[in-house]
Amino acid sequence: ASAVRQLRALGLDIWILSGDRAHSVHRVAQWVGVGVTQAWGECTPQDKLDRVRALQAQGKRVLMVGDGLNDGPVLAAAEVSIALGGAVPLAQARSDLVMMGAQLLTLPTLIQRARLTLRVVGQNLAWALFYNALFVPLALLAWLPAWLAGLGMAVSSLWVIVHSMRLARPLRGEEA
């Protein structure tokens, strides 16, 4: 339930697609805080695939977490797929990432880290483009001494490294 709350706080919609009996799936959905209308039981692999494709057709990006043999096709179809550590080899092979253990509580942290990483990479690229677009032409036109442009490039690289070190810090609420 805590993982579902945290994922919702990150702006994600949660769906349960399971091959288990519908009654059991609905009970688990209510227990963890997923609406019964977003919990589907007795799904075949094709049912899961159809539901994911329907969400994608609505413009949604799908992150799928699975562990079973029947999850292979839907894991391959999702934009991002995660197999739990104890997943069958087929599910692990079709996944982008294998999460060690079966702790879904690590999923919100994983998503926060991925978002932060994308943001930092984007900022680093923007900085590099800015620096190169401004200072390389100045050096080529000899309006900036080559040694100063070289020093600036070294400082720029150092800035990118230091800026990227933010990724090593624990996130808010995460233990070090």
Predicted regions and their residues:
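Conserved ATP-binding TGD loop and adjacent catalytic N/P-domain core of P-type ATPases
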Residues: A1-Q123
